[in-house]
């Protein structure tokens, strides 16, 4: 496998060296894993240049996603091969173990989701019909499926990292993400009275819950503590919705599907039609 590391101007040498070390930690554990023949790791100095790059890429390729600066590190395969981005300015002040977990996480995505099929979604007529019957037009359905796809991919990556002995970084990362859910709370308050918008924000809340449930399922003891932390972090969410998300998180793991697209569509059907959500 060929790895190209692109270090932009003025990135601190200590920072770039540490990022490469954390990248190698995953690569050394995953020698048996089949990966694309090429991986590009891009290390940015400032948020301004990082965001400018993504704006240009989206415009050229017609890609529609969320705001990349919301994440500690990002991955994509828009050009047909896996790319990972991390910005020094973005992670300044973030605990070292959390940034390590974020890098492990994105390398995991490169292994598992390094092809365009994981970033382009099909919306079958039956799924669109189900969405329409529950108040989701195509634009809203796309948002719902987008957030669900993030959660499912994160579930797969976190479980894999835990299985190869790198779960400690994911525990740190998830704990950090649960330390502040004020934005999620605000989103819930805005969406709670709209049946269609509720589905979208609840799909977004699965980003942390699905990985936690995955680690519980393979016997990671600390994951149960993290599960309690999730309940506390989302204490403002009504019990009906919390219970519905918990049941969904367990059920989606057991969905039988041959491809990611098939699993995503079946999960979307369940999420849209679930009366508890």
Q: Which role fits each region the language model picked out?
A:
Residues 102, 106-110, 114:
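Catalytic glutamate of the conserved HExxH
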Residues 101, 155-158, 203:
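Non-catalytic, well-ordered alpha-helical scaffold segments
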Residues 86-103:
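Short pre-active-site segment immediately N-terminal to the catalytic Zn-binding motif
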Residues 111-115, 165-168:
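A generic secondary-structure signal for well-formed alpha-helical elements
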Residues 147-167:
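An active-site-proximal "capping" alpha-helix that borders the catalytic cofactor pocket
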Residues 95-97, 112-147:
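Post-HEXXH active-site segment of zinc metalloproteases
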Residues 168-277:
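Pan-zinc metallopeptidase signature
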Residues 2, 10-84, 93, 143, ...:
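Auxiliary, metal-adjacent structural segments of Zn-dependent hydrolase domains
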């Amino acid at each position: 496998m060929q790895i190209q590391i692109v270090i932009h101007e003025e990135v601190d040498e200590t920072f770039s060296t540490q990022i490469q070390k954390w990248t190698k930690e995953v690569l050394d554990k995953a020698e048996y894993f089949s990966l694309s023949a090429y991986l590009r790791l891009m290390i940015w100095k400032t948020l301004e240049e990082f965001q400018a790059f993504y704006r240009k890429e989206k415009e050229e390729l017609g890609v529609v996603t969320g705001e990349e600066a919301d994440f500690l590190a990002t991955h994509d395969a828009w050009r047909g091969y896996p790319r990972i981005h991390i910005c020094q300015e973005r992670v300044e002040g973030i605990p070292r173990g959390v940034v390590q977990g974020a890098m492990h996480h994105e390398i995991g995505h490169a292994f598992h989701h390094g092809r365009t099929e994981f970033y382009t979604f099909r919306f079958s007529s039956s799924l669109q019909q189900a969405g329409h019957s529950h108040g989701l037009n195509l634009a809203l359905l796309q948002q719902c499926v987008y957030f669900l796809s993030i959660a499912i991919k994160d579930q797969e990556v976190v479980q894999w990292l835990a299985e190869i002995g790198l779960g400690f970084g994911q525990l740190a990362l998830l704990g950090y993400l649960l330390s502040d859910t004020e934005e999620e709370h605000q989103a819930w308050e805005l969406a709670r009275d709209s049946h269609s918008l509720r589905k979208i924000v609840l799909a977004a809340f699965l980003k942390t819950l699905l990985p936690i449930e995955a680690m519980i399922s393979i016997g990671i003891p600390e994951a149960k503590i993290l599960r309690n932390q999730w309940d506390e972090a989302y204490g403002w969410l009504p019990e009906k919705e919390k219970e519905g998300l918990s049941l969904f998180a367990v059920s989606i793991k057991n969905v039988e599907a041959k491809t990611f697209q098939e699993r995503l569509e079946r999960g979307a059907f369940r999420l849209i039609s679930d009366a508890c959500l």
